[in-house]
């Protein structure tokens, strides 16, 4: 239905899938709260997250905050490298976007792609749409960039000229593709797909289907994946057990055995080049001035704990086509 963003028509309903995936949806809440806390004590600037996520009363551990800083920095650097290579003549698909604020941050830096898509569970999308409707700081950029009188919107979807948010299950490729095409996704534009702690909650077959669809659907594309790695050791097993206690199963953990298994899953899904580094490597490559700044924010008692945590998460990226754009040259 067509509706004004200022007076949108919202409907709320839950499907059996929403209920079954409650544990996975809970990880969205956890990650959002951790990011909000890190922003609140100065790790990085984000004026938008406060309008989407509540501030936790519970202080987060320094190693968690530094881990999120490295995650945000790493994904941001690769994203901006893609935008520079394509001169923003591209589109971005943020898979499992949650309460992510990248669209608004990129607009502030004059780095918006031709269109930015977010996809997540319908219940998460409904919640985010509610915040967008209520907060002018979030809605105004969407309206300012919109070229028509009305926006396409319902409780699980918003489609505007430069931004779309879609409620969909990433395990249902046919439904996902149909909804994206309704929102004018182009298979001709260079496309960046981003997944942060998303594939690990899918079975290996389900994530392979998504990766193959992404590799086969676009003439030139890049995929950024942030998730667990080295999960076969004792530390990894403790992480798995902790999540299971919260009714959250890492269905795809077998592809998180090593950096090599992460690269291989991308190459075997049709991507032409693939790289993977653990987050300790990302942290070690941070600009020295930034490291000094963030390490002054909080005292970290045991560096070993940070290293253990960072060695169990990784940043992976893969490219397909786009040789004339130099996509293969993108690295962290």
UniProtKB/Swiss-Prot annotation:
GO cellular component, one term: cytosol
UniProt-listed Enzyme Commission number(s): 2.1.1.233
Keywords: Methyltransferase, S-adenosyl-L-methionine, Transferase
Keyword Methyltransferase in annotation: yes
Protein encoded by which gene: LCMT1
Family: Belongs to the methyltransferase superfamily. LCMT family.
Species of the source: Bos taurus (Bovine)
UniProt-listed PANTHER family: LEUCINE CARBOXYL METHYLTRANSFERASE, LEUCINE CARBOXYL METHYLTRANSFERASE 1
Name of this chain's protein: Leucine carboxyl methyltransferase 1
Residues annotated as binding S-adenosyl-L-methionine: 71, 96, 120, 169-170, 196
Chemical reaction(s) catalysed: [phosphatase 2A protein]-C-terminal L-leucine + S-adenosyl-L-methionine = [phosphatase 2A protein]-C-terminal L-leucine methyl ester + S-adenosyl-L-homocysteine
């Amino acid at each position: 239905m067509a509706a004004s963003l200022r007076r949108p028509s919202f409907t709320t309903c839950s499907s059996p899938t929403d209920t079954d995936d409650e544990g996975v949806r809970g990880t969205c809440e956890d990650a959002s709260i951790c990011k909000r806390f890190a922003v609140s004590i100065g790790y990085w600037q984000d004026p938008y997250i406060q309008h989407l996520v509540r501030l936790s009363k519970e202080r987060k551990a320094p190693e968690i905050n530094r881990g999120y800083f490295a995650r945000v920095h790493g994904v941001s650097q690769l994203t901006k490298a893609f935008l520079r290579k394509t001169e923003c003549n591209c589109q971005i698909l943020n898979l499992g976007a949650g309460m992510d604020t990248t669209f608004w941050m990129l607009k502030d830096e004059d780095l918006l792609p031709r269109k930015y898509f977010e996809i997540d569970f319908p219940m998460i999308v409904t919640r985010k749409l509610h915040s967008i409707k209520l907060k002018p700081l979030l809605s105004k950029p969407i309206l300012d960039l919109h070229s028509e009188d009305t926006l396409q919107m319902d409780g699980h979807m918003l489609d505007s000229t430069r931004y779309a948010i879609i409620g969909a299950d990433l395990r249902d490729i046919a439904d996902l593709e149909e909804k994206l095409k309704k929102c004018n996704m182009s298979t001709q534009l260079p496309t960046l797909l981003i997944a942060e702690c998303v594939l690990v909650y899918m079975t290996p077959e389900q994530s392979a289907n998504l990766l193959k669809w992404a590799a086969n659907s676009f003439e030139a594309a890049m995929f950024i994946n942030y998730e667990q790695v080295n999960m076969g050791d004792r530390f990894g097993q403790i992480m798995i057990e902790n999540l299971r206690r919260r009714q959250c199963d890492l269905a795809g953990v077998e592809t998180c055995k090593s950096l090599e298994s992460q690269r291989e899953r991308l190459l075997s899904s049709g991507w032409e080049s693939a790289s993977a580094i653990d987050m300790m490597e990302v942290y070690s490559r941070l600009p020295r001035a930034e490291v000094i700044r963030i390490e002054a924010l909080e005292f970290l008692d045991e560096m070993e704990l940070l290293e253990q945590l960072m060695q169990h998460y990784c940043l992976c990226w893969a490219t397909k086509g786009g040789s004339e754009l130099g996509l293969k040259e993108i690295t962290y």
